[in-house]
Amino acid sequence: MKLWGQILWTLLSVPRGRRGVLQGWAFNSWKTYSSLTGPLSATGMVNHWTRVFEERGIPEARESSEYIVAHVLGAKTFQSLKPALWTKPLTPQQLECIQELCGRRLQRMPVQYILGEWDFQGLSLKMVPPVFIPRPETEELVEWVLEEVAQRPHAVRAQDGPLILEVGCGSGAITLSLLSQLPKSRVVAVDKEEAAVSLTHENAQRLQLQDRIRIIHLDITSEGCCTHLLPWSPLDLVVSNPPYIFRKDMEQLAPEICSYEDLVALDGGDEGMDIITHILTLAPQLLNASGSIFLEVDPRHPELVSSWLQSHPDLHLSLVGVREDFCGRPRFLHVQKSAP
């Protein structure tokens, strides 16, 4: 899982190229299949499109072509296909579908949007642009929350399971992972974008988890947003992968991100702290006496968040833990509420 996670990270993190050149590549710049010799098999298509992607500067060329060919053949990954299918000649319909999907990849559409689904914490989630694509490191945030619930059962309501708020639910990846692994838990999930609210609803229904989730179309930066959430307090946990990219870094994002994903879900303001500070200001009003906040952040944020909390002692919040992602960067924060 972590290997594929690193592949996904590369797909979504390469330096931004010249976007104006990309759109013309889709259907007029690859060699035709007629130039290929031998049967047009799955392996042949992977090799062909890998070369095309490499020629056009598409990141992770082989992985992209393998995912697409496997998808057309009804599998999650190329390696999971039966070996007999690797060399079996493809039908004209399959070849046409592969060409269409690879054309989208040439336009730098993320593989997740091309396939229309992606796995997260073992769950198959529908993916629709421009809703934010869950990154592999966010799985580690979920794992940390699960560890905390297991190690500190006294800090959550033992009988009913934890009551959790997710800020910025996107596709529902974090919320639905927690619901699926904490059978007695309940989640209130909020997002300011209607498309994200709709997609979380759909994914919850696909996974039959809709009975334990309340999804609210809400901007937590809006005045009076707390009044919409108070009926569910006191909460045990707040979890979020908020917009945290420094505004000056937005121009360096890959074309896959800039052209297709909702940039509002990424832009965290000048220091990437705009939504983070809103969450930290809101959470104490909703959490129980020893409730916790788990955040995914930029590696520069642990120091900034610690300093900000020290300058706001009235919130009664303390940074009690920092964890690194699989690349060794400080990526996750655990902030805990204490008694006044």
From Swiss-Prot:
Pfam families given in the database record: MTS, PrmC_N
PROSITE patterns: N6_MTASE
Reactions that this protein is recorded to catalyse: L-glutaminyl-[peptide chain release factor] + S-adenosyl-L-methionine = N(5)-methyl-L-glutaminyl-[peptide chain release factor] + S-adenosyl-L-homocysteine + H(+)
InterPro entries with a match to the protein in the record: DNA_methylase_N6_adenine_CS, HemK-like, N5-glutamine_MTase, PrmC_N, RF_methyltr_PrmC, SAM-dependent_MTases_sf, Small_mtfrase_dom
Keyword S-adenosyl-L-methionine: yes
GO CC terms: mitochondrion
NCBIfam families: hemK_fam (TIGR00536), RF_mod_PrmC (TIGR03534)
Protein name: MTRF1L release factor glutamine methyltransferase
Protein source organism: Mus musculus
